[in-house]
């Protein structure tokens, strides 16, 4: 006969090895911060490409917080709180390399953090 403590220990071991997941709305600020973190990293890695895009599309503006985060190489996540979800979506999806570069990187970062999104 299996002891109750053995069952409890087995359940605890399984729970400890399973990665925690959270399902959030796409507009949740935690999702936006992950997206913006990827976006800022991509801007840093491809700055010339973003400058060329901005020159070709002068009406596409960025919040000052994004510009500050790009050039501040410390912890920038607190700078990015409060940017409206629709503005985050507009910025990220508005560049031609969204599907090829940003979307896969964002999906990977969300998955790594155990975050899955649902449509609003």
From Swiss-Prot:
Residues annotated as signal peptide: 1-20
Xref: InterPro entries: SRP1_TIP1, Yeast_SRP1/TIP1_CWP
This protein's UniProt keywords: Signal
MF annotations from Gene Ontology: structural constituent of cell wall
Keyword Signal on entry: yes
Keyword Signal: yes
A Pfam cross-reference name: SRP1_TIP1
GO biological process: ascospore formation; fungal-type cell wall organization
GO CC term (a single one): fungal-type cell wall
Family named by the database record: Belongs to the SRP1/TIP1 family. Seripauperin subfamily.
Identification of the protein by name: Seripauperin-8
Species for this entry: Saccharomyces cerevisiae (strain ATCC 204508 / S288c) (Baker's yeast)
Lineage, highest ranks first: Eukaryota, Fungi, Dikarya, Ascomycota, Saccharomycotina
Gene expressing this chain: PAU8
């Amino acid at each position: 006969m299996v002891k109750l403590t053995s069952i409890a220990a087995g359940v605890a071991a399984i729970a400890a090895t399973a990665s925690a997941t959270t399902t959030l709305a796409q507009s949740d600020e935690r999702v936006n911060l992950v997206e913006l973190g990827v976006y800022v990293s991509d801007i840093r890695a491809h700055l010339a490409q973003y400058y060329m895009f901005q020159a070709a599309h002068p009406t596409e503006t960025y919040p000052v917080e994004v510009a500050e985060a790009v050039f501040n190489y410390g912890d920038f996540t607190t700078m990015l709180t409060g940017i409206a979800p629709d503005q985050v979506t507009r910025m990220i999806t508005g560049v031609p390399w969204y599907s090829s570069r940003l979307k896969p990187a964002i999906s990977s970062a969300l998955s790594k953090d155990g975050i899955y999104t649902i449509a609003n």
